[in-house]
């Protein structure tokens, strides 16, 4: 894991979520842990540290029991193949050996209901946790990059920029894999100079091309402080 101090700097980057809301990475990482694991930290690590690690070592995080399972619904546990007393399950347990989603039938039926019952609500909640965790581990949700001259002020993730755009994004997007690789080395050497330089470069790009939707420094700081207060309040 990278240090908490360095992870905090990563948490100050801005992303655009699927609804178009602009938020600090720290807000997303906090929401991720709270919604998926029902906790503000994971084994003593901050949410920002965890999110960085997920993108460095996705295969590892597929195996980690981090998805909180609701009490009383043994059907979910039976379908995904975990112990009936298990409080948490790994993402991989929700898929079979061929990559098929084990809860597909139950969630399809649950989402069709206008007023789902408690049993169906449990499946919907589990499905949302699975999708949220997958979006984090895959990097799909990390929409760091404002699209130059986009009339809708859309931002994109590294995964969404695999085809040439004939803009400076074709170069800038590579900051993401470079950063996660550099952060691995930094966590071992304790020298975060290069990793922080990449974060600074990406932050400058966001401010230069983020347009009207980019968070101001005041709003960014206020939201991060609120996240810290919310965690402290629960201690």
Residue ranges: model-predicted function:
Residues 1-223:
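Soluble extramembrane regions of membrane proteins in the secretory/endomembrane system
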């Amino acid at each position: 894991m990278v240090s908490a101090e360095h992870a905090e700097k990563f948490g100050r980057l801005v992303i655009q979520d699927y609804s178009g809301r602009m938020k600090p990475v720290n807000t997303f990482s906090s929401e991720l842990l709270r919604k998926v694991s029902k906790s503000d930290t994971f084994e003593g690590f901050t949410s920002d540290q965890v999110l960085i690690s997920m993108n460095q070592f996705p295969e590892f995080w597929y195996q980690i029991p981090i998805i909180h399972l609701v009490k009383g619904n043994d059907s979910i546990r039976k379908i995904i193949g975990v112990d009936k007393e298990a409080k948490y399950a790994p993402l991989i347990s929700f898929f079979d050996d061929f990559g098929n989603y084990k809860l597909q039938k139950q969630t399809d039926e649950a989402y069709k209901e206008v007023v789902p019952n408690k049993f169906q609500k449990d499946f919907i909640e589990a499905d949302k946790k699975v999708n949220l965790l997958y979006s984090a581990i895959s990097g799909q949700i990390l929409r760091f990059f404002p699209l130059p001259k986009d009339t809708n002020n859309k931002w994109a993730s590294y995964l969404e920029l695999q085809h040439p755009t004939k803009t400076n994004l074709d170069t800038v997007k590579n900051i993401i894999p470079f950063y996660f690789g550099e952060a691995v080395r930094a966590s071992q050497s304790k020298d975060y100079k290069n990793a922080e330089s990449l974060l600074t470069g990406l932050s400058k790009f966001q401010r230069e091309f983020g347009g009207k939707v980019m968070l101001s420094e005041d709003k960014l700081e206020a939201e991060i402080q609120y996240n810290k207060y919310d965690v402290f309040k629960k201690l």
